[in-house]
Swiss-Prot record:
It comes from Escherichia coli O6:H1 (strain CFT073 / ATCC 700928 / UPEC). The keyword Transferase applies. It comes from the Bacteria. This is Putative pyrophosphorylase ModD. The lineage of its organism: Bacteria, Pseudomonadati, Pseudomonadota, Gammaproteobacteria, Enterobacterales. One of its GO terms (biological process) is NAD biosynthetic process.
Length: 284
């Protein structure tokens, strides 16, 4: 489970409600008891539920019912129902709706990608990068895990990943073996992941025996050719495809023999459509 502190929950609320709801205050309806319900209009893999519930309870509302993160919801299915005074209900309305719509959009997009991949490779995986929309990293991580994806890198201190921009600063930027050996000496507990931008670089990298080789923006044909020769050059190396991988392009790579894909596309998916209904207690 990804942990969000109370301060982070408060920040999600404060973006919208720091001054309260003027309309509710002017109508003098804030003291009335009522319910709020969130419905997913189109169906799909949901996330952001636990965060949404924490936001609602922070406002003093009581959760009556909620689905679980990662659930496959039907079109029109209720995701959350909470109760409390109308002032708190209206304060939570849009802030929570925004979290749910963005989170569910991310998780459902990734779930669709995984379903497509696993029709071809049941053991296939998709890892999502740290290139999330600024300020959304923790929500994004929750959504990725809810959909069944992997977190590629939570931060640059978590894993070793040798890019061309690192090699540019080396005395010999084509000395893959030297770079990989140095990384192994100085980070002996970590797997060594490297990225190649061309087939020539990929072959040179494989000869240096990395643990994982990322192929960046390779065509399906180039990826297939590398996948065919990799077992003889580096039998213990895992291949991954990255760069431009999304729901539309993924199908072009399903025959190349690579089972791990790296993407940031889900973060930019269309938000889910969440319907919100607020009603006084007497009408429920």
């Amino acid at each position: 489970m990804i942990f969000l502190s109370q301060a982070q929950i408060d920040a999600l609320l404060l973006e919208d409600i720091q001054g309260g709801d003027l309309t509710t205050r002017a109508l003098n309806i804030g003291h009335q008891h009522g319910y709020i319900e969130f419905f997913l209009r189109q169906g799909g893999c949901v996330s952001g539920i636990s965060v949404a519930c924490k936001m609602l309870t922070t406002l003093g509302l009581t959760i009556d019912d909620a689905v679980s993160d990662g659930s496959q919801a039907n079109a029109g299915q209720r995701l959350i129902r909470a109760q409390g005074n109308a002032a708190a209900l209206h304060q939570g309305w849009k802030a929570v709706q925004n979290v749910l719509e963005w989170s569910c959009g991310v998780s459902d997009y990734l779930a669709q990608m995984l379903a497509l991949l696993r029709e071809r490779y049941p053991d296939g995986n998709i890892a999502c990068t740290r290139k999330a929309i600024p300020g959304t990293r923790l929500l994004a991580s929750q959504a990725i895990l809810a959909a069944g994806g992997l977190i590629h890198r939570a931060g640059c201190a978590e894993t070793i990943l040798l890019f061309a921009n690192h090699r540019h600063f080396l005395h010999d930027n084509q000395d893959w073996s030297g770079a990989i050996n140095q990384l192994r000496r100085h980070a002996p507990e970590k797997k060594i992941v490297v990225e190649a931008d061309t087939p020539k670089e990929a072959i040179a990298a494989l000869r240096a025996q990395p643990d994982v080789l990322q192929l960046d923006k390779f065509s399906p044909q180039q990826a297939t050719e590398i996948a065919q020769i990799a077992p003889s050059l580096a039998p213990h190396c895992t291949l991954a495809l990255t760069g431009g991988i999304n729901l539309t392009t993924l199908k072009n790579y399903l025959d190349c023999g690579i089972r791990l894909f790296i993407t940031s596309a889900p973060y930019y998916a269309a938000p889910a459509d969440i319907k919100v209904s607020l009603q006084p207690a007497a009408s429920i």
